[in-house]
Amino acid sequence: MSQLQESAVLSLAKDLISRPSVTPLDEGCQSLMAERLSQAGFEIESMVFDDTTNMWARRGTQSPVFCFAGHTDVVPVGDLNRWHTPPFEPVVIDDYLHGRGAADMKGSLAAMLVATERFVNKHPDHQGSIAFLITSDEEGPFINGTTRVIDTLEARNEKITWSLVGEPSSTHKLGDIVKNGRRGSLTGNLTVKGIQGHVAYPHLADNPIHKAAPALDELARMKWDNGNEFFPPTSFQIANINGGTGASNVIPGALEVMFNFRYSTEVTAEILIERVLNILDAHGLDYDISWVYNGLPFLTGEGPLLEATKAAIKKVTGTDTDPQTSGGTSDGRFIAPTGAQVIEVGPVNATIHKVNECVKVSDLELLTDCYEAILENLLCK
């Protein structure tokens, strides 16, 4: 066996991947991590909310608090016949570790833990505290996961100073991109009311599709803002639309539309809601609408966490990383509102949520070194 195949981070990543922890299952991943963190001097606190398993682990009692955040749950594997290897039987092929969760994000979890073990061994009297916030409900409804842990910490005034989320942020090579912010996400569920009837007698019915179409067109064409130097302009997308009985001779009685905003810091959810309602009202629609607040936008500007991350990636990989705010949401959106600086640093995201998910073994080694260097930059001054 090669040295890479025998490494601590690869061994742990394999152990984690072998556990089929599809949301909201944890399948013992956190217990495995907790055992090793306990040996490194961490106090372990399990927080179980309904069907979700969470772990808060902390070493030290002083500020500042550096927190690794991540999730043990993975998305479903999909069609097993399309996998080259069984998704929960991790295997290395040509320097790539294959398995569900390899990139998102059990590889990152392994790198976090091994980096922390090494750091604590070298610097047992480090400044501040190190913490882990791990959940089994990131890929799912995100109701009983990180948000509940944060509520618990806030209730007892336990604050995180810096948080590194291990989401796969890299695009082409490890460290080329980190996420120092994310757009907000707001979902609208709209029902436009009409009167069902026969298509041959439209004067006896009221077609909600015809009524809604101009309003939806205006919403789709609207320029919501211009973005700024950190965020692209706010985007509006219709995700689902449903109306009709399936018959060609029936005018539907209602039209259901689900749409989503990914919005910048130039607007708020309240502003977007007000503008949507004004457009719907201007078109004279009879409607019901409900809203789902998926997360606020956040941004970590220049400061200790971003500087430490840039320096670590440059030292380990030679790459000048590019901080970006593009992409979907992450659990960082629940941590940032507490006042913490938040950044996402992880492996290449080319295969996440796909069949044959994989990550370069050599990247896991580099990621471990990056995480350890970030700890040193922040807690060894």
Curated annotation (Swiss-Prot):
Assigned protein family: Belongs to the peptidase M20A family. DapE subfamily.
Enzyme class: hydrolase
Catalysed reaction, written as an equation: N-succinyl-(2S,6S)-2,6-diaminopimelate + H2O = (2S,6S)-2,6-diaminopimelate + succinate
Pathway: Amino-acid biosynthesis; L-lysine biosynthesis via DAP pathway; LL-2,6-diaminopimelate from (S)-tetrahydrodipicolinate (succinylase route): step 3/3
Keyword tRNA processing listed: no
Record-linked InterPro entries: ArgE/DapE_CS, Bact_exopeptidase_dim_dom, DapE_proteobac, Peptidase_M20, Peptidase_M20_dimer, Peptidase_M20A
PROSITE patterns named in the record: ARGE_DAPE_CPG2_2
Example GO BP: L-arginine biosynthetic process
Pfam families, A to Z: M20_dimer, Peptidase_M20
Domain of life of the native organism: Bacteria
Residues annotated as the enzyme's active site: 73, 138
Keyword annotations from UniProtKB, A to Z: Amino-acid biosynthesis, Cobalt, Diaminopimelate biosynthesis, Hydrolase, Lysine biosynthesis, Metal-binding, Zinc
Cofactor note: Binds 2 Zn(2+) or Co(2+) ions per subunit.
HAMAP family membership: DapE (MF_01690)
Organism: Shewanella pealeana (strain ATCC 700345 / ANG-SQ1)
Gene: dapE
Functional note: Catalyzes the hydrolysis of N-succinyl-L,L-diaminopimelic acid (SDAP), forming succinate and LL-2,6-diaminopimelate (DAP), an intermediate involved in the bacterial biosynthesis of lysine and meso-diaminopimelic acid, an essential component of bacterial cell walls.
Cofactor: Zn(2+); Co(2+)
Protein's recorded name: Succinyl-diaminopimelate desuccinylase
Residue numbers binding Zn(2+) 2: 104, 139, 353
The keyword Zinc-finger is annotated on this UniProt entry: no
Molecular function GO terms recorded: acetylornithine deacetylase activity; cobalt ion binding; succinyl-diaminopimelate desuccinylase activity; zinc ion binding
Enzyme nomenclature, EC number: 3.5.1.18
Assembly information from the UniProt record: Homodimer.
Residues the entry annotates as binding Zn(2+) 1: 71, 104, 167
